[in-house]
Amino acid sequence: MRVADFSFELPESLIAHYPQPQRSGCRLLSLDGPTGALTHGIFTDLLDKLVPGDLLVFNNTRVIPARLFGRKASGGKLEVLVERVLDDHRVLAHVKASKAPKPGTELLLGDDESIHATMLARHDTLFELRFDDERDVFTILDAVGHMPLPPYIDRPDEDADRELYQTVYSQRLGAVAAPTAGLHFDEPMLAALREKGIEMAFVTLHVGAGTFQPVRVETIEDHIMHSEYAEVPQEVVDAVLACKARGNRVVAVGTTSVRSLESAAKSSDNGLIAPFFGDTKIFIYPGYHYQVVDALITNFHLPESTLIMLVSAFAGYKNTMNAYQQAVAEQYRFFSYGDAMFISRNPQASTEMISLNSTDNQ
């Protein structure tokens, strides 16, 4: 398939720059995978779509204030976006500068340039930096870092984003982007779900900046996926197996939960799913056979992104592109701070034949 097959027209006005005043106050577009039927509603309708015994799987990663501004000690301005924390003092980071720093370059970071760091080495597109400070990396970032809002939210980060660009259940520090489907869940909503008998489990996937990188090839099969660290512990495996055994649905909250669960399934030698601790580069696009996830809660994604490809593999390509066309027509809010979808899996999606520009693709 071509990347261009996943393009759609999106007016700039539909990109949400701020979240709704109430987390669960967003709109919800429900897509029935087997039929393609669409239903318009609000996020709290989810309570009526789930039944006792269904399992919601959340990603409990916590976004770090990963963006730093500063300069080289020699003078040139730069911007640092931490991609991964290696230990208490070293990180891998994207560095934006007029001239890339060389190993040994001293950096002065933070709005007041109070943080000293050294560029140790370059690893492809990432730079290994060491913070020359007695405090650990997370403490430094919390003190001087900026929240790494997505590039399409065209405004400076604000103090409120430290709370709003974070799920209420986030625990594990390490993401540089929020698992945004989870932003819609507030404490009253979680309490109502528990009261109804909905089970909950938590995976961890530290979302990297690669989630916003455009696909730079014409044919999606040629795309090389970025790597992210994920954990699917034994208790999640047990919860998934118990859910399947009682005939209920595994409902992934967000594409990162999908990628975590499906990575754990692929790593299982015998059985449906096994514990998973490590880097995943799983790339899900039409033709993929889902092994674990039965339903998906997700936001609206960028045109030509790997995430709209993942959704197309789940709901079916035609169903997905039709839903997006309807969402634009009905003026749903898009991307990280936007509205949500609830999608049930289309069992025919993996064999759907797509005919575009007189070319049949599997």
UniProtKB/Swiss-Prot annotation:
GO molecular function, one term: S-adenosylmethionine:tRNA ribosyltransferase-isomerase activity
Reactions accelerated catalytically: 7-aminomethyl-7-carbaguanosine(34) in tRNA + S-adenosyl-L-methionine = epoxyqueuosine(34) in tRNA + adenine + L-methionine + 2 H(+)
GO cellular component, one term: cytoplasm
Annotated Pfam families: Queuosine_synth (PF02547)
InterPro entries found in the cross-reference section: QueA (IPR003699), QueA_dom1 (IPR042118), QueA_dom2 (IPR042119), QueA_sf (IPR036100)
E.C. no: 2.4.99.17
Subcellular localization, as worded in the UniProt entry: Cytoplasm
Keyword Repressor included in the entry's annotation: no
Alphabetized UniProt keyword annotations: Cytoplasm, Queuosine biosynthesis, S-adenosyl-L-methionine, Transferase
GO biological process: queuosine biosynthetic process; tRNA wobble guanine modification
Transmembrane segments: none
Listed pathway(s): tRNA modification; tRNA-queuosine biosynthesis
Assembly, per entry: Monomer.
Family recorded in the similarity comment: Belongs to the QueA family.
Primary role: Transfers and isomerizes the ribose moiety from AdoMet to the 7-aminomethyl group of 7-deazaguanine (preQ1-tRNA) to give epoxyqueuosine (oQ-tRNA).
Name used for this protein in its record: S-adenosylmethionine:tRNA ribosyltransferase-isomerase
